[in-house]
């Protein structure tokens, strides 16, 4: 009896291994690598964090709380926002033949409400929702709503001109990353979009990006302050939505229009707020592997990447910032003051699209749709690397403009 039970237990393991090998893909390999690092982090935590990976394992879980504050309420409010914004945004975007879901992540990061809002606005067009929510939503939206406001709270006032110039250079290549990421999505997933459709949907994005670039060139201080106000406003709105959703769900008292945030789905038994919190948890269990992986990448390839920085003509701190960007741009901004002027420019330009590529954005994408992991990585890195090239070419002109302004 015990033997047959043991055999049955082993068959569960062997069958699951066989299924994994049979369905192997680039995405599944990336996920497996992260899960190996998750185990490394867990073991190191048990051993008292001797190698530093246990701390990164914990950071993955600790990220769930802040993510829930910015994500859960907006996931719950996505139907409300779509009801309010849809009638205004859809006609404008339809003029260009673009889907209104592109609006969501032009201004919002995927993990700050952009993804659920994009999916809601896209409706039955899942492919364009994924493209807007995860390709565009990991590049342009995070820059507007997160990177600029957060950077303003960390860097000195003297460095704000470098921030503006870097964002200017970085935004130029966002459409390139979106096109490449969209093509990769069509080639590697079930979500198919033609190049013509991708280009058509990027028209409003290109127009908005161009206006921002022009604004940053002619009135950088006003534009940067405007982004700061916008970021603060988004935080306020997100907090209000979260508070309303929680109040409704706990008390059962509903408000007009907002009642959809707490109504349980008949099939899943989950309310939109429940779904938002579940999504945060799913992202967190990926981050507990992603963060130790990034730590290993930084330790292993940091030296080589710093040599690349030297080839670009930037100092050691700026080279270290490039490596930090791959996980989280906050670490980069913390050493911003120690960088040389060109290093500051290149770091911000790279951060516009490439920041979080192996950190939060990888974890978020894997948490909501594993099939999109590779297209997102490809799109972000292409946009980030081309931004470095553009920033390097524009550096003499941009830096002289900053110097003359001072």
Where are these regions (language model features)?
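Signature of multi-pass transmembrane helix bundles
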Residues: 5-73, 132-137, 144-289, 366-406
């Amino acid at each position: 009896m015990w033997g047959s039970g043991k055999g049955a237990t082993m068959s569960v393991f062997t069958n699951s291994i066989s299924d994994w090998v049979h369905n192997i893909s680039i995405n599944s390999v990336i996920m497996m690598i992260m899960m190996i690092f998750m185990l490394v982090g867990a073991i190191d935590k048990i051993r008292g964090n001797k190698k530093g990976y246990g701390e990164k394992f914990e950071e993955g879980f600790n990220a769930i709380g802040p993510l829930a504050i910015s994500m859960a309420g907006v996931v719950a409010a996505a139907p409300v926002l779509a009801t309010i914004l849809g009638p205004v945004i859809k006609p404008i975007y339809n003029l260009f033949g673009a889907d209104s879901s592109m609006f969501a992540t032009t201004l919002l990061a995927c993990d700050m409400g952009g993804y659920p809002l994009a999916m809601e606005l896209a409706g039955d067009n899942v492919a364009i929702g994924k493209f807007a929510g995860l390709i565009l939503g990991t590049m342009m939206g995070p820059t507007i709503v997160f990177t600029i406001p957060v950077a303003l709270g960390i860097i000195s006032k003297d460095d704000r001109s470098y921030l503006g110039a870097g964002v200017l250079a970085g935004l130029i290549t966002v459409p390139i990353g979106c096109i490449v990421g969209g093509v990769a999505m069509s080639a590697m997933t079930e979500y198919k979009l033609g190049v013509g459709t991708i280009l058509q949907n990027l028209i409003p994005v290109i127009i908005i990006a161009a206006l921002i670039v022009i604004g940053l060139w002619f009135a950088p201080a006003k534009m940067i302050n405007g982004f700061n106000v916008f970021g603060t406003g988004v935080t306020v709105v997100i907090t209000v939505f979260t508070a309303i959703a929680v109040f409704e769900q706990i008390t059962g008292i509903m408000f007009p229009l907002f009642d959809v945030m707490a109504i349980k789905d008949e099939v899943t038994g989950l309310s939109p707020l429940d779904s938002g919190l579940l999504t945060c948890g799913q992202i967190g269990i990926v981050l507990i592997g992603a963060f130790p992986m990034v730590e290993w990448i930084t330790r292993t390839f940091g030296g080589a990447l710093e040599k690349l920085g030297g080839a670009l003509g930037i100092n050691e701190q700026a080279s270290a910032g490039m490596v930090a960007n791959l996980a989280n741009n906050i670490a980069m901004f913390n050493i911003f003051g120690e960088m040389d002027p060109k290093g500051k420019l290149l770091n911000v330009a790279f951060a516009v699209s490439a920041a979080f590529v192996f950190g939060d954005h990888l974890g978020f994408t894997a948490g909501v749709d594993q099939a999109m992991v590779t297209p997102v990585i490809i799109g972000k890195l292409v946009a980030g690397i081309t931004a470095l090239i553009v920033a390097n070419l524009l550096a003499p002109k941009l830096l002289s403009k900053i110097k003359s302004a001072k």
